[in-house]
Regions:
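Amphipathic, Lys/Arg-enriched alpha-helical "gate/interface" segment within cytosolic domains
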Residues: 2-117
Length: 117
């Protein structure tokens, strides 16, 4: 896993690339690692997340997003979410984007803009 710490509009961001995140525990370790490096705004790519993240019945998305909130971080997940037909997932994405702590976006540039707005 690669964590690239950068500055954008005077704010510290972490962009995570590399191996998939296979569990909520791995996600927590990643979040803590980024925060330890001074980045409270984190970008990950949807294809890094376990497929069950996008099946809300598993509770994995809620568990990971709760950790983002608990540690007062902000997260952007970059990907094409139109491929998911679940109405509940689309509603979840809409509500998350509305609140702004976790954003589901189409590009890294959009992620940076949302996180640093």
């Amino acid at each position: 896993m690669n964590i690239e710490i950068t500055e954008y509009k005077g704010q510290t961001l972490a962009e995570v690339t590399g191996i998939p995140i296979q569990s909520p525990q791995e996600a927590l370790e990643l979040l803590i690692n980024c925060a330890y490096q001074g980045a409270e705004k984190i970008i990950i790519h949807a294809d890094q997340l376990m497929p069950d993240f996008f099946d809300l019945k598993t509770g994995i998305a809620g568990e990971i997003l709760q950790k983002v909130s608990t540690y007062q971080l902000r997260l952007a997940i970059v990907g094409d979410f139109s491929q998911y037909s679940s109405k509940s997932l689309q509603d979840f994405i809409f509500e998350s984007n509305k609140v702004g702590r976790v954003n589901f976006v189409a590009s890294v540039e959009e992620a940076k803009e949302k996180l640093c707005a």
